[in-house]
Each structure stands twice: as structure tokens, then as C-alpha cells.
């Protein structure tokens, strides 16, 4: 057996391979009501709801408002499984959303869908990347 094969084997009784499960859902949201995109408290509550819906465990959440041209709100939720990041630009009616989780039990797609449904963009793009170790 090669060294590489040894490293890929798991010594668990089930014989399952030992690996990291990484699920990354991210996207761009267009043509959103500017008032919603500038409401820091609403957006922070929305991200907290998404954490719970996706079966994540919150470590800390922070939200910031940015004024001036290209201003908006950023909300970052650090979760045991990884993070949710929401960034808005109210002048452009635009937001980006990033939901990354590790582990089999979390559901980043449900968190993404919850935030998209609440913000109600006229259109959006969603992307998925498998960030697993194998």
C-alpha cells in the first residue's frame, strides 16, 4: 500500500474515509429595495435567522454601516461551521451573499434561500462550490 493510500484511510470502525465536508453557496443579488439594504438591524436579524435555519451554531455576529458613496451594510456571522457574510450597496440596489459551512449537518443552501427570499431581489445568481477535502 502506498503512503498516499495510507493517508486516505480512516481507522474508524465504520471504515469511512476521514475528510472535511465543505459546502460553499454564494451569489449576487440585484435590484433590491434600497431601504432594506441600509437597515443594519433588519439585516443582522435576517442573518441570525439564516444561521438557525441552516442548523449552524453561532459564535459571534457583527454588523457595520458604511456611509457615503458606495455605502451600505456588512453583516458577518462567525459560526462553528464557518461563516455567513452579507454585504450591501444601497446606492446600487445590490448585495453579495456568502454562506460557507463545514460538516454534514449544516445546510448553507437553506440559509442562502432564506436571505434571498427576505430581500426579494428582482434577480440573483447563486453558485455552489464543493470545498470538501476529498
UniProtKB/Swiss-Prot annotation:
SUPFAM superfamilies: S-adenosylmethionine decarboxylase. GO terms for cellular component: cytosol. It comes from the Archaea. It holds the Pfam family AdoMet_dc. The keyword ATP-binding does not apply. NCBIfam families: SAM_DCase_Bsu. Binds 1 pyruvoyl group covalently per subunit. The modification Pyruvic acid (Ser) is found at residue 82. Belongs to the prokaryotic AdoMetDC family. Type 1 subfamily. This is Arginine decarboxylase proenzyme. GO terms for biological process: arginine catabolic process; polyamine biosynthetic process. The active site is at residues 82, 87, 102. InterPro entries: AdoMetDC_fam_prok, ArgDC, S-AdoMet_deCO2ase_core, S-AdoMet_deCOase_pro-enz. Its cofactor is pyruvate. The lineage of its organism: Archaea, Thermoproteota, Thermoprotei, Sulfolobales, Sulfolobaceae. Keywords: Autocatalytic cleavage, Decarboxylase, Lyase, Polyamine biosynthesis, Pyruvate, Schiff base, Zymogen. Specifically catalyzes the decarboxylation of L-arginine to agmatine. Has no S-adenosylmethionine decarboxylase (AdoMetDC) activity. It catalyses: L-arginine + H(+) = agmatine + CO2. One of its GO terms (molecular function) is arginine decarboxylase activity.
Amino acid at each position: 500500500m502506498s503512503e498516499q493510500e495510507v493517508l486516505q484511510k480512516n481507522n474508524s470502525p465504520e471504515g469511512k474515509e476521514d475528510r472535511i465536508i465543505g459546502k460553499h453557496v454564494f451569489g449576487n443579488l440585484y435590484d433590491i429595495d434600497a431601504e432594506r439594504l441600509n437597515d443594519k438591524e433588519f439585516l443582522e436579524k435576517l442573518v441570525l435567522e439564516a444561521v438557525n435555519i441552516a442548523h449552524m451554531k453561532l459564535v459571534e455576529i457583527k454588523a457595520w454601516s458604511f456611509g457615503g458613496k458606495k455605502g451600505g451594510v456588512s453583516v458577518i456571522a462567525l459560526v462553528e461551521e464557518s461563516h455567513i457574510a452579507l454585504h450591501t450597496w444601497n446606492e446600487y440596489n445590490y448585495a453579495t451573499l456568502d454562506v460557507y459551512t463545514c460538516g454534514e449537518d449544516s445546510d448553507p443552501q437553506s440559509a442562502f434561500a432564506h436571505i434571498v427570499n427576505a430581500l426579494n431581489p428582482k434577480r440573483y445568481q447563486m453558485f455552489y462550490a464543493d470545498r470538501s477535502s476529498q
